[in-house]
Amino acid sequence: MVRLNLAVVALAAGALSASASASSSATPLRGLLTDAAKYQPTKDAQSQLRWKCLDGSKELSWSAVNDDYCDCPDGSDEPGTSACPNSSFYCHNTGHMPAYIRSSRVDDGICDPECCDGSDESDGKIRCPNRCEKVGKEYRKKLAELDNLRRAGAKVRDKYIAEGRKQKELLHAEIAKLEIEVQVATENEARFKAELTRAETSDKALIDAKVKTPLYTKLVDYQNAIRALHVKNAALKAELQTLTLLLDDLAKGYNPNYQDMAVKGAVVAYKEWRGIASAAAAATATGEVKEEGENNVDQIAGENTKLNELLDEGDWPWAKLSTLLSDDPLDLMDRGLGGALDDKRVYASETDGGLLFRIHEYLPDGIVPYFEAMVDTLLDVLMKANVITDVKRMRPKSSVGSESEPETVSVARRAHTDAAAHLSRTTHELSSLKQKLSEFSTRYGRSAEFKALENKCFSKDMGEYTYEYCFFGRATQIPNNGGAQISLGTFTNFNPKHDKSADEDAYWLQQIYARGQKCWNGPERSAIVDLECSTENKVLDVFEAEKCIYSIKVATPAVCFPPQQQQAQQTQQDGGHQVKDEL
């Protein structure tokens, strides 16, 4: 009977041991995710539960896990205690957001706010209530408020984007206009340069005679007419594009509820002219009707067929017309007389090999004027006898430095100087505008949303000083009790740490203002500007974070990015885990 009782006791003890082992392997460990597959024990030959450190350095009894003694070098055996200094404790926070805290804060007698479920304190030193339901409710309420704020700010941001795109289109039109002006100025400079060369190398009487002919006058008039028509056409194109942008804004912002039939009729007629109304009707017929407010920036800019037809240059583009202006009228007249008169024309220049026109190079300076007079007399006799009909001669340069140049040369030189100066100014202006255009995506945001804020300033009174912040301008410290203003720097760039890509929203959330006024016995002042989403622009806070380095917090709708995009980036930054502290 005694033996039977002992056997029963042994069986019961074995069953309890097996049940405890099974329970220990099935119960989630404290301080771990519920699906922590790496914390699963194995049985050895004696059916004892064993477990290896995550770094593989040791094998322990399963009972050594979370026994408040650090056995593993990597601290992986104590996820739920403070025994290992470098490990992390996982708070489930059911009803709120999970979080990790350092293991040294476990069972330290302090209720950590990150663990709203109180799981970090379980040794009886202090009782931490489970506040996750309340905290989660407050967090979700705050999240909804932030989302509403972001959506309201995003609508203002859309207006900034529309304004930025409008300014970009105007800049494109101005560049196109200047490109034509540069082309015309280049041709004028070349023409005046040729006239200067001709004035310096040709006989004045012959040129004056040609200039007075009706043919020369007609050629000049035709070329001037072509240039004037081209400039006028370019100006009309630019004005057409500008008016189209203005009407786009009217069509986009028009409110039909005001029942202004005149404006409504004008908007409907304009949409029909642009083809927008037909496109909208087609979209309605196919069921592709977007929600109100969605894609409101690009609603008008889809159809440009009518505008492109008006801007098309047809069979006579400027590249073709410019060929008619490349020749000087005098050269055209000379070529027009070619063929029948080539055998009678005599050309002479410094490069001609004829001895008649180079003999003065071998004569003493005092005899050269008499020789030139004799040559002129001979040429006049030949021309009157119809032996030759035309002559171009280069007279030898006078060795007398005080002799003034002919009036025709002076006039031609002044005209060429003015044309060259105009070309230089126009080219510089065009280069400057192209530089501004290239900065749109790198300076004013991915969608040019910051362009509308350029040089707009906002200030905040901080007691002793008032701080003024200007978008893409200066940051200034202004004493409230009088005194000189101090520059904290001018805008330099976004992303001062150079650790993010322009495709990321976080890239546009921080600016640096550098090269401010030098501190006394210190470096130049600078400021780091942190931007956050809001429905209005304002300076929130300013303080001197380090010596001569200021921190400025600014609210602006320009950084109210689409919520889905920001949430995806936030998840990526957190390594795929959404971890939130208590608000």
Swiss-Prot record:
Gene Ontology cellular-component annotations: glucosidase II complex
Gene Ontology biological process: N-glycan processing
Subcellular location: Endoplasmic reticulum
Keyword Transcription regulation set for record: no
InterPro entries linked to this entry: Gtb1-like (IPR039794), Man6P_isomerase_rcpt-bd_dom_sf (IPR009011), MRH_dom (IPR044865), PRKCSH (IPR036607), PRKCSH_N (IPR028146)
PROSITE patterns referenced in this protein's UniProt entry, alphabetically: ER_TARGET, MRH
Highest taxon above the source species: Eukaryota
Domain named MRH: residues: 455-562
Keywords from the named record: Coiled coil, Disulfide bond, Endoplasmic reticulum, Signal
Any single Pfam family the record assigns to this protein: PRKCSH-like
Primary role: Subunit of glucosidase 2, which cleaves sequentially the 2 innermost alpha-1,3-linked glucose residues from the Glc(2)Man(9)GlcNAc(2) oligosaccharide precursor of immature glycoproteins in the endoplasmic reticulum (ER). Specifically required for the cleavage of the final glucose. The subunit beta retains the catalytic subunit alpha in the ER.
Oligomer and partners: Heterodimer of a catalytic subunit alpha and a subunit beta.
Protein's UniProt name: Glucosidase 2 subunit beta
